[in-house]
Amino acid sequence: MDAFSASLMADKREIIFAPTVYKFQTFAQMAEEFKLGERDVVLTNEFIYTPFMKELGLKCNFVFQEKFGAGEPSEAMIQTMYDAIPYDSYDRVIAVGGGAIMDLCKLLGCKRPDTVHNLYFKRFPVQHEKDVIAIPTTCGTGSECTNISVAIVKDEKDGVLTGGETKLGLVSDDIIPNKVCLIPDLLKTLPYKPFACSAIDALVHATESFLSPHRKTMTSELFSEKAMDMILKGFKLIDEKGKDARFEYLDEFVTASFYAGIAFLKAGCGPVHGMSFPLGGTYHVPHGESNYMLFGAIMDYYDAHNPDGEIMKFKELVARILGCEVKNAIPEMNALLQRILPLRPLRDCGFTEADFKIFPQSVETNQQRLMTNAYYPFDLESEEAIYRKCY
């Protein structure tokens, strides 16, 4: 185990609840409460700005994330953002968007590094300097309340660039936003597939936190359980009434995502994230979908190897919500998720035969923070078997 993973396990805090949390009906109410003005930089997307902010006539500096490039944050995107938003041009950062915008705005609140690469490989210190207000517009990332900023970076081994890319999480309590504002109204513009991927992502966060063998606490478990309960009930509603039923449940979905974020801030995520990161880094599969691709297979792996541990409590919880027998809880959950969003096999995103060896090596090299938090241990062979099962 690496020293950083060991330090996470040694953390004796019962729960980490750093941001002050608000809930508003509209963005206009939030803007009035916080007196947004010309020294505020608002990082968002144009498709969010136009229906919710444009008509307010605010004097903020509105910046659209898409001008820096498509997809999830990368070294190049972050550097382009730094160049476009001079450090002395703002006093406060407002993040209005999904996980990518949350991750980017956490960096805007910190001292600028010498290089983005050095920042993510822990060769430049993280130092919080400016307030960040996080406003999620998806219901999955939970990033609005966590101490992690994820980016696709140039991969290296023993300090030497390999020529490939991977995803790394920058972890520091200094990047936790100062305030969080939950505004369910902002989720109305989210198309169905990104909605489903993000909600499944939140379920993964809650599940991995619940099954965390070393870092879970009684308090984090409360947030995990409530998040799983709300998300699965929401999925049942959609399954019964159709896709548009989600609009009746947006408050619950955005709140459940936040609860899951609180849970994994303390208890941590695990191999679903660890094994999905190279998938996102190499083939640019969106984070929630890449987690979903591996989630069911990893849960089956846990149940096969240690069915009577904490996963039994998980199955009992799922069985109660879904109204099935405990022994059928994981298959029934996987079937429900398939009805919410059909599962793509890895081959559909470009996964190759060579990746069955390359990906486990990358996971073992770069993702120990996540793999050491496994409910049941993995090795290179078991990781390869998971990828093959999902292929």
Give the location of each predicted region.
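ATP/NTP phosphate-donor binding region
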Residues: 1-92, 346
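N-terminal small/polar loop signature for handling phosphorylated ligands or for N-terminal nucleophile
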Residues: 50-119, 124, 237-249
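A glycine/threonine-rich phosphate-anchoring loop and its flanking beta-alpha core
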Residues: 113-216, 309, 313
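Glycine-rich phosphate/pyrophosphate-binding beta-alpha loops
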Residues: 140, 258-291, 368-370
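C-terminal and late-domain segments of enzyme folds
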Residues: 192-259, 263
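Gly/Pro-rich interdomain helix-loop hinge
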Residues: 282-356
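Short, amphipathic C-terminal "tail helix"
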Residues: 355-391
